């Protein structure tokens, strides 16, 4: 199984790249994890936000292909770390690759939400999307460590 993080936005600050890359390099070779960045639509005073969301969503879904789609969204399920580890195990048993979708400033398109098999809420708080990349990578690495009895996670 391959994990794929599909996120709106490019040219992240150095701290985001450093944090994300740190966890990315820790993943084992039998569970590759990749980042696909989708360019954010141009937003301005008179921007058509629905059109922008739809275009971003179209690009995200194209990147995900036939993968299992999991959206990151405030109304999603708030998995704790052991629950995320269980989900990771289920995904592995399913055999398909998994694409986790992070929307842009206005969130995800309705098409992305409709295509999702699951929705995961990191928090009831609104989080900056660059930070979410790092949190997702760390959370998935921690979940993997639980499933393999790696000493990274301590109860």
Swiss-Prot record:
CC annotations in GO: cytoplasm
Binding site for S-adenosyl-L-methionine: 72, 103, 122-127
Membrane-spanning residues: none
Pfam families registered for this protein in UniProt: SPOUT_MTase
Keywords of this entry: Cytoplasm, Methyltransferase, rRNA processing, S-adenosyl-L-methionine, Transferase
EC numbers for this chain: 2.1.1.177
Catalysed reactions, semicolon-separated: pseudouridine(1915) in 23S rRNA + S-adenosyl-L-methionine = N(3)-methylpseudouridine(1915) in 23S rRNA + S-adenosyl-L-homocysteine + H(+)
Matching InterPro entries: Alpha/beta_knot_MTases, RlmH-like, tRNA_m1G_MTases_N
Subcellular localization(s) per the UniProt record: Cytoplasm
Main location: cytoplasm
One Gene Ontology molecular-function label: rRNA (pseudouridine-N3-)-methyltransferase activity
Function in brief: Specifically methylates the pseudouridine at position 1915 (m3Psi1915) in 23S rRNA.
NCBIfam families membership: PRK00103.1-1, PRK00103.1-4, tRNA_RlmH_YbeA
Subunit composition and interactions: Homodimer.
HAMAP family: 23SrRNA_methyltr_H
Family, per entry: Belongs to the RNA methyltransferase RlmH family.
The protein's name in its UniProt record: Ribosomal RNA large subunit methyltransferase H
Record organism: Enterobacter sp. (strain 638)
Source lineage: Bacteria, Pseudomonadati, Pseudomonadota, Gammaproteobacteria, Enterobacterales
């Amino acid at each position: 199984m391959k994990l794929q993080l599909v996120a709106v936005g490019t040219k992240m600050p150095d701290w985001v790249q450093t944090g994300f890359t740190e966890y990315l390099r820790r993943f084992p070779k039998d569970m590759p994890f990749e980042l696909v960045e989708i360019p954010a639509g141009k937003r301005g005073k008179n921007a058509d936000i629905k059109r922008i969301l739809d275009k971003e969503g179209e690009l995200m879904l194209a990147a995900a292909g036939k993968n299992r789609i999991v959206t990151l969204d405030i109304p999603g399920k708030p998995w704790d770390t052991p629950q995320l580890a269980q989900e990771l195990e289920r995904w592995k048993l399913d055999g398909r690759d998994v694409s986790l979708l992070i929307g842009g400033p206005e969130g995800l398109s309705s098409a992305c939400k409709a295509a999702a098999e699951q929705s995961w809420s990191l928090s009831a708080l609104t989080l900056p999307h660059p930070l979410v990349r790092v949190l997702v990578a760390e959370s998935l690495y921690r979940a993997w460590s639980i499933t393999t009895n790696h000493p990274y996670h301590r109860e």
